[in-house]
């Protein structure tokens, strides 16, 4: 939020420099991100002087240029070539001398000695646009030579001033500080603590018309006080909507706002001055009445010319015919604002429900200065002053305008201050230092916190309603501490430390980092997707059934209305997005939680909700080119076997043997054909992988194969917890390899063959690998050929041929007897 140093000084007396103000605000919790000098005219007219044109002759080589001599208060006049049609001898002009830097928008250029059509020029005569003092570019600026002196700095003549803008980072709980007066209030408390007692002050305003007298515009509030705690306004007639005076325009421009007209500018000024949003309705467009009501299912064009789709949950201010004029707390409608033809307005100062404003603003994708404040919760007691401040300024700046009738004020349940009990002894304990009681009381008073009663260890406090962040004793203690000064609280002479062994959660986190580094090193990129998903993704799926989805009560949109059951869809979105950007390789991984409704789950810990299951999950996506074409390689696409290899590498890195898991093909409608899974022998799922079904890929316009593996990290991590590190000598005797080529039923898997071989030879069989698979011609129907390698090793001696042959015969017989296999 931008804070003007000059405007801030109008609310609190101080002798601090802008940098000192920034340091002071940061020390009390209003962090200042930067301080920038802002000049009323960009560039400050540096290098520009007033000159008198002594002579003006037509350029000998051009019929539209003139060669002038200009007195700029130097020893000799300057020769300057000028193309402006209104240049003439005897005129006073603005001269940019050599070396002057002129700024035009975001660009700047330096005036240099030049030669124009053969004639030397030692400067430039300037127009309003070229130096930023106006919009006339038809000719150069002409001044009265009788009242100006050559050599006078242009900055002095035009009254250039400068201000400083402080960029204050407001935390979400400090809505009271989202205005100049709010910041001034905190700064006054700081100064008082530094021994410079002062208070923030507001300018005088017109007295508010009585709320009981009739307002000439009927207003109906058709919602309860929850949605609209207060709605206040009055009618101003006889307006002539003109351009704002220079001081108001400059102030808004300093804050980064664009001046529009005097009425709109005043409402924006008061918003930044006091923090209360306002809105002015052109009475000619209201139909003679206003209504605060819930919208219909309708569209509305907003002031920024965007079209918003309203729902029955949106609060609006409507005309006599029910047409929405303004989205409450967010933005006005394009057809309700004030223009140069406006003569009568209804000036609104209201308080709307923070949650309602936030939901509407998010759904409409609109973020305004008004919604920024309403979303954080405003004090309904402060609408009247803001209303009268704006009315006072409008009447002052628009002569002939007047307030017609009384003030409408719908305030059914007045907001009360917060009642808090402070125990000074608890304050000392929490801060870690004794705070003198009178000093604590002075700090509270400087923050406008009233001490109703003050017993020895029980102070009854009344906190202003605008301090929505101070509702508990701990909040009050924090307020005392920040004004007392964090730097004034000494460190304790004792050092306290807690040492605890590394727990299961720490070990799980370490394993996650280990695997992330492994995957990143293998060429994967990590994804970070939203846990919210679209219900439409799950339609018709049995593996992720819609009746197991966790629905959001108040979704931001229909595309983010459920919690995800699988990580798959987030990865498909990433692949689709990058595929459209001509990427070729898609190797992704993501850590995330998946959610499902599970009525059988009972609450067991503080973080476990009854009826829901939350699973930590690791997702892997492999798609596109594994190796992209080059002089050394042809394109090589990703394959399901590559994905399986990465999964096995993960298991291996955690010390988990593939043999300790049950591998099988499973039916899964996420995949083409069947999926492949690993599970514990007691049935707990660990890995599910396969080729994503083309019908799913089509939803994301993906036309390449995608292979996906989803790892249940909760179950895998439990297995890793049971792994023990074993240390063994390096083998001293050679490994022996023997191969078998087998003809068997096509439904038999390699994992089944490997497990059968290990059961047949438990001691000396070290590994089994598959090096060839063949199906097709020259084989009986329903058969396939597997070529397997068996690795044998004895750690105590070199194996003999007789011993090797006996083991291989035993393995072969076991496979033949179990699966009916035959040697090829």
Regions found by a protein language model. Give the residues of each.
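Terminal amphipathic helices with adjacent charged low-complexity linkers/tails
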Residues: 187, 191-223, 398-427, 434, ...
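Extended, well-folded interaction surfaces typified by the phenylalanyl-tRNA synthetase beta subunit core
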Residues: 420-424, 428-586, 738, 791-796, ...
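Phosphate-backbone binding interfaces of nucleic-acid-interacting proteins
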Residues: 1-211, 346, 363, 369, ...
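A carboxyl-terminal module marker
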Residues: 2, 445-449, 469, 473, ...
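Glycine/proline-enriched, intrinsically flexible loops and inter-domain linkers
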Residues: 4-5, 23, 28, 40, ...
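Beta-rich nucleic-acid/ligand-interaction surfaces
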Residues: 40-44, 207-209, 270, 462, ...
């Amino acid at each position: 939020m931008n804070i003007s140093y000059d405007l801030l000084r109008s609310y609190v007396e101080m002798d601090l420099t802008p940098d000192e103000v920034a340091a002071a605000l940061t020390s009390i919790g209003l962090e200042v991100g930067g301080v920038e000098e802002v000049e009323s005219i960009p560039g400050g007219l540096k290098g520009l002087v007033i000159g008198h044109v002594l002579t003006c002759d037509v350029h000998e080589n051009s019929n539209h240029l003139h060669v002038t001599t200009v007195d700029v208060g130097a020893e000799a006049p300057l020769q300057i070539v000028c193309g402006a049609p209104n240049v003439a001898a005897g005129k006073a002009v603005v001269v940019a001398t050599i070396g002057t830097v002129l700024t035009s928008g975001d660009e700047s250029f330096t005036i240099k000695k030049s030669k124009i059509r053969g004639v030397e020029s030692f400067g430039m005569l300037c127009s309003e646009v070229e130096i930023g003092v106006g919009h006339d570019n038809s000719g150069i600026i002409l001044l009265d030579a009788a009242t100006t002196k050559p050599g006078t700095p242009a900055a002095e003549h035009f009254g250039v001033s400068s201000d400083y803008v402080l960029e204050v980072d407001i935390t979400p709980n400090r809505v009271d500080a989202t205005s100049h007066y709010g910041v001034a209030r905190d700064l006054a408390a700081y100064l008082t603590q530094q021994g410079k007692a002062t208070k923030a002050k507001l300018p005088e305003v017109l007295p508010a018309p009585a709320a009981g007298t009739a307002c000439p515009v009927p207003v109906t509030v058709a919602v309860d006080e929850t949605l609209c705690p207060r709605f206040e306004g009055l009618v101003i007639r006889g307006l002539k909507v003109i351009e704002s005076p220079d001081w108001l325009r400059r102030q808004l421009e300093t804050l980064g706002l664009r001046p529009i007209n005097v009425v709109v500018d005043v409402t924006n000024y008061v918003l930044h001055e006091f923090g209360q949003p306002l809105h002015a309705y052109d009475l000619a467009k209201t139909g003679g009445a206003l209504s605060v009501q819930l919208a219909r299912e309708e569209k509305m064009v907003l002031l920024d010319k965007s079209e918003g789709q309203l729902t029955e949950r949106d609060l609006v201010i409507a005309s006599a015919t029910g047409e929405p004029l303004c989205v409450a707390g967010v933005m006005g409608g394009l057809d309700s604002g004030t223009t140069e033809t406006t003569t009568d307005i209804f000036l609104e100062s209201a308080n709307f429900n923070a949650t309602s404003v936030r939901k509407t603003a998010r759904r409409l994708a609109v973020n305004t200065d008004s919604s920024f404040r309403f979303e954080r919760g405003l004090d309904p007691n402060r609408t009247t002053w803001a209303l009268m401040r704006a009315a006072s300024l409008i009447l002052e700046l628009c002569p002939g305008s007047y307030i017609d009738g009384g003030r409408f004020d719908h305030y059914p349940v007045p907001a009360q201050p917060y009642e808090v009990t402070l125990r000074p002894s608890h304050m000392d304990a929490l801060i870690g230092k004794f705070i003198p009681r009178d000093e604590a009381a002075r700090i509270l008073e400087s923050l406008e916190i009233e001490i109703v009663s003050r017993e020895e260890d029980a102070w009854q406090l009344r906190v202003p309603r605008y301090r929505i962040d101070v509702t508990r004793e701990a909040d009050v203690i924090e307020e005392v501490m920040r004004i007392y000064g964090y730097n004034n609280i000494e460190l304790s002479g004792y050092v306290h430390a807690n040492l605890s062994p590394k727990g299961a959660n720490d070990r799980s986190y370490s394993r996650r980092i280990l695997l992330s580094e492994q995957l990143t090193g293998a060429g994967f990129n990590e994804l970070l997707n939203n846990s919210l998903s679209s219900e439409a993704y799950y339609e018709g799926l049995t593996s992720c059934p819609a009746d197991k989805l966790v629905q959001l009560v108040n979704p931001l949109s229909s595309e983010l209305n459920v919690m995800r059951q699988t990580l798959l869809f987030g990865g498909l979105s990433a692949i689709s997005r990058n595929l459209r950007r001509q990427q070729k390789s898609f190797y992704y991984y993501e850590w995330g939680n998946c959610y499902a409704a599970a009525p059988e789950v009972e609450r067991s810990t503080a973080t476990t909700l009854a009826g829901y299951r939350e699973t930590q999950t690791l997702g892997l996506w492999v798609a596109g080119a594994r190796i992209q074409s080059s002089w050394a390689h042809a394109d090589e696409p990703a394959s399901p076997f590559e994905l399986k290899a990465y999964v096995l590498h993960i298991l291996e890195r955690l010390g988990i043997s593939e043999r300790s898991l049950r591998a099988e093909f499973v039916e899964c409608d996420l995949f083409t054909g069947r999926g492949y899974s690993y599970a514990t022998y007691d049935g707990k799922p660990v890995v599910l992988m396969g080729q994503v079904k083309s019908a799913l890929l089509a939803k994301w316009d993906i036309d390449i194969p995608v292979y996906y593996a989803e790892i249940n990290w909760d179950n895998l991590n439990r297995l890793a917890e049971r792994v023990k590190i074993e240390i063994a000598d390096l083998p001293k005797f050679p490994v022996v390899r023997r191969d078998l080529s087998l003809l068997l039923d096509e439904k038999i898997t390699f994992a089944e063959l490997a497990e059968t071989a290990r059961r047949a030879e438990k001691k000396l069989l070290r590994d089994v690998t598959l090096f060839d698979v063949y199906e097709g011609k020259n084989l009986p129907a329903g058969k396939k050929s597997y070529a397997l390698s068996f690795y044998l090793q004895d750690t105590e001696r070199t194996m003999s041929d007789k011993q090797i042959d006996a083991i291989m015969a035993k393995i072969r017989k076991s496979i033949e007897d179990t699966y009916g296999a035959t040697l090829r």
